[in-house]
Swiss-Prot record:
The record marks Y161 as: Tyrosine radical intermediate. InterPro entries: D1/D2, Photo_II_D1/D2_sf, Photo_RC_L/M, Photo_RC_L/M_CS, PSII_D1. A quinone binds at H215, S264, F265. Belongs to the reaction center PufL/M/PsbA/D family. One of its GO terms (biological process) is photosynthetic electron transport in photosystem II. It catalyses: 2 a plastoquinone + 4 hnu + 2 H2O = 2 a plastoquinol + O2. It comes from Citrus sinensis. 2 of the reaction center chlorophylls (ChlD1 and ChlD2) are entirely coordinated by water. Herbicides such as atrazine, BNT, diuron or ioxynil bind in the Q(B) binding site and block subsequent electron transfer. The gene is psbA. It is a multi-pass membrane protein. This is Photosystem II protein D1. Tyr-161 forms a radical intermediate that is referred to as redox-active TyrZ, YZ or Y-Z. [CaMn4O5] cluster binds at D170, E189, H332, E333, D342, A344. Its main location: plastid.
Length: 353
């Protein structure tokens, strides 16, 4: 009898917990994805803050020349970063218990792997939580689909690219200058500026910014005034009202006369779908481009592609970019190797005369 009562009590507790977790009445929705999201993001955030402030230098290249990244070791907000896990570790799973000591774990850049893996799991769960809340509210799932673009980009940079290159040391450092360094090295090694998927991503990001600014300014400029000229237009609206707050016909007419008739949308749904889809598809392509370049399927190479009738090279912009790439690659990991591979592979000229 006692066992039955205890089981019923535990079932009631579990049922109450389930109802609380999945309740849409909470100030912040938790959901089952949130059960995993909260601890993973808290772990990633707390370790990032501690490591950014106090982590010792990391032997990123695996050549016993540690690189400092934390504030207490001489960096500032701009130059500071979480240094990626050492090349000596490669792609091995490297939790604290795999190292001989905490000092060794820190020296080999263990915090980077810990932060990145928890962060990726956390943002994936955040995306799942968006879908879960939409489902429980009877909404369509497109919010989570849109969020999949930055999740895909982060996964490509922090996970797919290191896998393709064979080491977490090739991942993006977690800092401002570290991000720029990653971008420069990526251009030097993969010629990303000449990759069509990156071009689509640039069009998506900048085009999305342009369209968002155009839409916001058009809506703000075509509000339906419910007040007198002496009152603020904002005073004529209440949150959640059923009536339209702006005149889409007026906005459509204005934009059609500004450019041409068919350059503007007269359907609100198709307009907002376009505003969402343009940057999302662009960022999807960027993530796909990073993932292909991770396995060295690089941008187009048009080096020395134009020659005159005598066979002499006529330099193009592609050749200028190639020279810049070589210079950036020489500067990269200057202690790990003397020359980039494409320079070192060239046969040296004879010195015998």
């Amino acid at each position: 009898m006692t066992a039955i009562l205890e089981r019923r009590e535990s079932e009631r507790l579990w049922g109450r917990f389930c109802n609380w977790i999945t309740s849409t009445e909470n100030r912040l929705y938790i959901g089952w994805f949130g059960v995993l999201m909260i601890p993973t993001l808290l772990t990633a955030t707390s370790v990032f803050i501690i490591a950014f402030i106090a982590a010792p230098p990391v032997d990123i290249d695996g050549i016993r020349e540690p690189v400092s990244g934390s504030l207490l070791y001489g960096n500032n907000i701009i130059s500071g970063a979480i240094i990626p896990t050492s090349a000596a570790i490669g792609l091995h799973f490297y939790p604290i218990w795999e190292a001989a000591s905490v000092d060794e774990w820190l020296y080999n850049g263990g915090p980077y792997e810990l932060i990145v893996l928890h962060f990726l799991l956390g943002v994936a769960c955040y995306m799942g939580r968006e879908w879960e809340l939409s489902f429980r509210l009877g909404m369509r799932p497109w919010i989570a689909v849109a969020y999949s673009a930055p999740v895909a980009a982060a996964t490509a940079v922090f996970l797919i690219y290191p896998i393709g290159q064979g080491s977490f040391s090739d991942g993006m450092p977690l800092g401002i200058s570290g991000t720029f360094n990653f971008m420069i090295v990526f251009q030097a090694e993969h010629n990303i500026l000449m990759h069509p998927f990156h071009m689509l991503g640039v069009a998506g990001v900048f085009g999305g910014s342009l369209f968002s600014a155009m839409h916001g300014s058009l809506v703000t400029s075509s509000l339906i005034r419910e007040t007198t000229e002496n009152e603020s237009a904002n005073a004529g609206y209440r949150f959640g009202q059923e009536e339209e707050t702006y005149n889409i016909v007026a906005a459509h007419g204005y934009f059609g006369r500004l450019i041409f008739q068919y350059a503007s949308f007269n359907n609100s749904r198709s307009l907002h779908f376009f505003l969402a889809a343009w940057p999302v598809v662009g960022i999807w392509f960027t993530a796909l481009g990073i993932s292909t370049m991770a396995f060295n399927l690089n941008g187009f190479n048009f080096n020395q592609s134009v020659v005159d009738s005598q066979g002499r090279v006529i330099n193009t912009w592609a050749d200028i970019i190639n020279r810049a790439n070589l210079g950036m690659e020489v500067m990269h990991e200057r202690n790990a190797h003397n020359f980039p591979l494409d320079l070192a592979a060239i046969e040296a000229p004879s010195t015998n005369g």
